[in-house]
Structures are given as structure tokens and as C-alpha cells.
UniProtKB/Swiss-Prot annotation:
Entry superkingdom: Eukaryota
Protein name: Late embryogenesis abundant protein Lea5
Description of what induces expression: By salt, drought and heat stress.
Gene label: LEA5
The UniProt record lists the keyword Calcium: no
Coiled coil: none
Keywords: Stress response
Residue ranges crossing the lipid bilayer per the database entry: none
PANTHER family, alphabetized: LATE EMBRYOGENIS ABUNDANT PROTEIN 2-RELATED (PTHR33509), LATE EMBRYOGENIS ABUNDANT PROTEIN 41 (PTHR33509:SF34)
InterPro entries per UniProt: LEA_3a
């Protein structure tokens, strides 16, 4: 009885492997066309975008700071001393009640 079960296991193992391989292959085959269709759709949308302007030259977003010499972003505002800022913002007028 044990020999017959062993032989049945040996005969059924390749069949089971073949079935599982065919199922997994079928799954990949069904998924592949959808992936290529969506990819081409993305590529077509990129072609419809307006072209990026190239005449801006070779400018960089970073420029040397005239005071320190270190590079900093070009669009950065000038730093104000905290004491000067406080002086500008505080209202020193005294109101009579």
C-alpha cells in the first residue's frame, strides 16, 4: 500500500507542477497586454505636453552671496537684523486715553 501511494505521488507531482505553471503563465500573458497599453498611453500623453523652454540659458538657481562669498539661492530675500526688524514693527507712539 505504501509503495502504491509513493508511486502515485511520483506520477501526480509533475502533473500538478504543469498545471500550476500553466496557470501562472496564463496570468502573466493576460497582464502583459494591459501593461503595454497603459505604458503607450502614458508615452502619448507626454508627447502632447508643451515643450520646455530651452532659451533660459545655463543659469543656475544658486549664486554667490556678495557679502559672504558662499553660494545661496538666487531668489532668497535679504536677511534683516532682528533688532532692526523689531524697531520697524513696533509702534512707539503712546496714545492718550
Amino acid at each position: 500500500m505504501a509503495r502504491s501511494l509513493f508511486k502515485a505521488k511520483l506520477l501526480l507531482a509533475p502533473v500538478a507542477d504543469g498545471i500550476s505553471l500553466s496557470i501562472s503563465r496564463r496570468g502573466y500573458a493576460a497582464a502583459a497586454p494591459l501593461g503595454t497599453i497603459s505604458r503607450t498611453g502614458i508615452m502619448e500623453k507626454n508627447d502632447l505636453r508643451p515643450a520646455v523652454r530651452e532659451d533660459s540659458g545655463a543659469s543656475s538657481a544658486w549664486a554667490p552671496d556678495p557679502i559672504t562669498g558662499y553660494y545661496r539661492p538666487e531668489n532668497r530675500a535679504v536677511e534683516i537684523d532682528p533688532a532692526e526688524l523689531r524697531e520697524m514693527l513696533l509702534n512707539h507712539k503712546v496714545r492718550a486715553h
